[in-house]
């Protein structure tokens, strides 16, 4: 009811605030006997953590995860997996000036209206700091998916502000601070971000995330369609304002002869559907894109009101990402992993015995 748990069979409950003592999560429903490498969990957290480049927030958090339960001798036990990350670099004094103010485009006003009280320090529970635990849980899901079904999930930044990539080289993604697969675009992105920092402004981004080696049959029509649950998961990421599956909104301008993914005995000839038909996976790559809005915390003054309704100008202090999309790739990967694993387990439970004569090559 309170919206802090995600999933049906493979569930994740997170807790903690941006400037609290710690962040944590409980992962339940993990199959037993799966080899879980804590180093791989930490690796994904390191990809997301703040303070790694001048283009992201300068808050310095080690984000070292502690696995408290559910793993014994390197394998899942089938019991709840508890994980914890301590907050170590809070600077709550930076937010003293806005404790009675509503920052434009932030969750300050809506949290205040819903709960009648809000933790103004770094946004409290509404901060993207919480996504560290989604990444930790998603890293567990990734390992289960790869072990049981061979499914792999990875993503990249496909657009930074007005700069869109023109090619995808997976080897380049970890060679720059933007998760950008197009090396030719990196210098342009760097120059753009430097100018943006001098201006004191922010910008949005687009992330693409893909599950490869998918299996057909995942998804529970009518109300738990795979693409519907994926859109739900991705829209739940902080700052996300749009989700596309496959061709997405480009489908509006396509003719049916172009958009339909024709089939031969050797497989599908295209993947405009993004790997989902009728809410069920086809076995092709599952492809999604998310649009993230510009960061709302700016050093430039903006008009707002305080909790008494008085007009004010807000200037946000503190350390903030000039583009939240730069660190969003591992978060999007995590949410896709949680959705795919949850549906894979649900499919295995009800339809695991189903066999058909023919499978279209993915």
From Swiss-Prot:
HAMAP family: Chorismate_synth. The gene is aroC. Keywords: Amino-acid biosynthesis, Aromatic amino acid biosynthesis, FAD, Flavoprotein, FMN, Lyase, NADP. This reaction introduces a second double bond into the aromatic ring system. NADP(+) binds at residues 48, 54. It holds the Pfam family Chorismate_synt. PROSITE patterns: CHORISMATE_SYNTHASE_1, CHORISMATE_SYNTHASE_2, CHORISMATE_SYNTHASE_3. Belongs to the chorismate synthase family. GO terms for molecular function: chorismate synthase activity; FMN binding. FMN binds at residues 125-127, 238-239, 278, 293-297, 319. Its EC number is 4.2.3.5. Reduced FMN (FMNH(2)). Homotetramer. GO terms for cellular component: cytosol. This is Chorismate synthase. It catalyses: 5-O-(1-carboxyvinyl)-3-phosphoshikimate = chorismate + phosphate. Pathway: Metabolic intermediate biosynthesis; chorismate biosynthesis; chorismate from D-erythrose 4-phosphate and phosphoenolpyruvate: step 7/7. Its cofactor is FMNH2. It is an enzyme of class 4 (lyase). InterPro entries: Chorismate_synth (IPR000453), Chorismate_synth_AroC_sf (IPR035904), Chorismate_synthase_CS (IPR020541). GO terms for biological process: amino acid biosynthetic process; aromatic amino acid family biosynthetic process; chorismate biosynthetic process. Coiled coil: none annotated. It comes from the Bacteria.
């Amino acid at each position: 009811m309170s919206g802090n748990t995600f999933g049906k069979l493979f569930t994740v409950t997170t807790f903690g605030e941006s400037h609290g003592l710690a962040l944590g999560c409980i992962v339940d429903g993990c199959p037993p006997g799966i080899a879980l490498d804590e180093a791989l969990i930490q690796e994904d957290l390191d990809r997301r953590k703040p303070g790694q480049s001048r283009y992201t927030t300068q808050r310095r958090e080690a984000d070292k995860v502690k696995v408290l339960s559910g793993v014994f001798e390197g394998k899942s036990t089938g019991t709840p997996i508890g994980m914890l990350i301590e907050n170590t670099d809070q600077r709550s004094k930076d937010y003293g000036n806005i404790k009675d103010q509503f920052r434009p485009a932030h969750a300050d006003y809506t949290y205040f209206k819903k709960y009648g009280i809000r933790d103004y320090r770094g946004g409290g529970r509404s901060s993207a700091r919480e996504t560290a635990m989604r990444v930790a849980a998603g890293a567990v899901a990734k390992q289960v998916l790869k072990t049981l079904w061979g499914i792999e999930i990875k993503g990249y930044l496909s657009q930074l502000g007005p700069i869109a990539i023109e090619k995808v080289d997976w080897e380049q993604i970890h060679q720059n601070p933007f998760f950008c697969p197009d090396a030719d675009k990196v210098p342009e992105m760097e120059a753009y971000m430097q100018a943006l920092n001098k201006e004191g402004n922010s910008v949005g981004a687009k992330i693409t995330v893909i599950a490869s080696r998918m299996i057909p049959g995942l998804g529970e029509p009518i109300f738990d369609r795979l693409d519907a649950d994926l859109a739900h998961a991705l829209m739940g990421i902080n700052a996300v304002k749009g989700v596309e599956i496959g061709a997405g909104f480009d489908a509006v301008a396509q003719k049916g002869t172009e958009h339909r993914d024709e089939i031969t005995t050797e497989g599908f000839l295209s993947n405009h559907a993004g790997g989902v038909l009728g809410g069920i996976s086809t076995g092709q790559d599952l492809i999604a894109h998310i649009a993230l809005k510009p960061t709302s915390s700016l050093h430039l003054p903006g008009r707002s009101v305080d909790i008494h309704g008085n007009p004010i100008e807000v200037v946000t202090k503190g350390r903030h990402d000039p583009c939240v999309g730069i660190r969003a790739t591992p978060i999007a990967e995590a949410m896709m992993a949680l959705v795919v694993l949850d549906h894979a387990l649900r499919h295995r439970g009800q339809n695991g015995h189903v066999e058909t004569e023919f499978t279209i090559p993915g």
